[in-house]
Amino acid sequence: LMALWVVSQYLKIKNGKDFVPRTVIFGGKAAPGYYMAKLIIQFICNIAEVVNKDPDMDGKLRVIFLPNYSVKLGEMVYPAADLSEQISTAGKEASGTGNMKFQMNGALTIGTLDGANVEIRDLVGEENFFLFGKTESEIEELWQNSYYPQNHMDEETWEAINLIKGGHFSGGDTSMFSPLVDNLIYHDPFCVMADFHSYSKVQDDVSNTWLDRQKWNTMSLKNIANSGFFSSDRSIKDYCDRIWGIK
């Protein structure tokens, strides 16, 4: 989802449209046998190579992939981030703690109603959280009604997809990322296409908010101030009182 959005923003810049500068950082690793995850990482790295070498992108867009993302690497990333991308499809991901670490360090969150995002949004207030995407029940309804990804693709999405299909990020090789493209437009098990328009629109809200520095900083401080619920002290006390019955 995020990589596809970067491609769409790349196209906007190439077409001369206004763009609030971004440095987009990806981090992760793939299990040895997870072919699609490896292909996505290759795709991200290829996007970075094309974008970062394009003079039209200077001062506007940069893409970075951090390989073998780890706790140690996270110690440098969490304090440096302005925006936390918590974009799993609603109902598809177990709750983690990365979003809490970003929040405690002042990053604002763009995310779906999935995992601990729900608690973060409840704590900081909906006005201090960039919400996008379908809910878990809406995702279930899509599948019950025979979800077909192409029904959710607008002109912006098709332009990005066609650029990928044409080999722009694979040195002219039109087959390299065809498994990824075919998966998105014919299968899309994580409903990327269903969420893409909403995600792109909310990213515009992120950019506009960033330009209002006082508003952004106020939102950041409110996120930090309301992050205490996720502290280990609170969690341990809660366990002692409600489960273990000790002091």
What are these regions (language model features)?
Residues 1-75, 79, 89:
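Long, K/E/R/D-enriched contiguous segments that form extended
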Residues 22-24, 83, 109:
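Hydrophobic beta-strand segments of well-ordered beta-sheets in folded domains
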Residues 79-80, 87-220, 224-229, 234, ...:
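Catalytic binding pocket for nucleotide-activated donors in carbohydrate/polymer assembly enzymes
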